[in-house]
Structure formats: structure tokens, C-alpha cells
């Protein structure tokens, strides 16, 4: 008798992100680089300055910023999701496309910051990360703003 495998997906509780909050968390900023080979560039979610009416101290924001693992794919290298020997696409296809929200590893990758030119009220820059295509952990199927960063 064949074994039945069940696929389990984990979704955030609030599936409908506020469009204004989503635009603030993932502003339209160019990363200033293009990925080479099988690498992917992910824009990490910006961290709010306050939660509710409580203004977060700088140390808390920095901790959350560097422990944030939710991002948006902004660029794919020319060899992303391809067999490096044959240059053919992976049989299962691409795991993520540009515009998809993903979970990335807490450690690893190359990170850099870009300032938002027209955002004078928020001095916090946008954080980008380059990592290998096979290092993406998951596609976010729920609200990317509802996931918490864990230290």
C-alpha cells in the first residue's frame, strides 16, 4: 500500500496586509546591484519605529532589523533555479519569482543598506540581502507584515 504524504503550510493569522503599510515596509528602492550566477537579491522588511503608541528604543529596532527574516525578492541572477552543469531549469521550477515574499535564513548572505531618497521623516535605510537561490527557506503565503522577528 502506498504511503500518503500530507503537505502542511504555515500561514500568518492576518492574511490581508494594509497596502500603505506594505508600501512603507517594502518601498520601491533599487538595490544598486544585480545578482550574479545563481544568486537572489531580497529586500528585507523595514522595521517600524513604534508599536501602538510605544516608541521603540534604538537597540530594539537594531535587534529586530538584523533578526528580521521576511523579505521580498527583487532580482534573480541569470543562473537562479538552473542546473549549473546543464543550464536547464530545475525540474520543480523556480521556488520564488521577483515580487514574491519569502523567508530567508537569519545568518548568512551578504547584506547592505540603501537610503530612501524621498523619505526624510524616516532616517532608517532599506536593507537588502544577496543569497544563493537554494538558501531561500519558504514562500510567505500569508501577510508578510504579521511575522515577528525573533532574537
Provide a role label for each language-model segment.
Residues 2-151:
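Compact, glycine-rich, soluble single-domain proteins
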Amino acid at each position: 500500500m502506498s504511503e500518503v504524504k500530507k503537505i502542511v503550510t504555515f500561514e500568518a493569522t492576518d492574511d490581508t496586509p494594509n497596502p500603505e503599510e506594505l508600501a512603507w515596509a517594502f518601498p520601491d528602492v533599487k538595490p544598486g546591484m544585480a545578482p550574479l550566477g545563481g544568486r537572489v537579491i531580497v529586500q528585507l522588511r523595514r522595521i517600524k519605529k513604534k508599536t501602538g503608541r510605544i516608541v521603540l528604543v534604538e537597540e530594539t529596532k537594531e535587534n529586530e532589523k538584523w533578526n528580521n527574516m521576511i523579505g521580498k525578492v527583487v532580482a534573480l541572477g541569470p543562473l537562479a533555479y538552473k542546473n549549473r552543469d546543464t543550464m536547464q531549469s530545475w525540474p520543480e521550477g523556480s521556488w520564488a519569482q521577483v515580487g514574491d515574499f519569502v523567508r530567508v535564513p537569519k545568518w548568512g548572505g551578504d547584506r547592505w543598506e540603501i537610503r530612501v531618497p524621498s523619505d526624510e521623516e524616516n532616517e532608517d535605510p532599506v536593507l537588502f540581502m544577496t543569497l544563493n537561490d537554494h538558501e531561500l527557506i519558504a514562500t510567505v503565503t500569508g501577510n508578510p507584515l504579521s511575522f515577528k522577528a525573533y532574537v
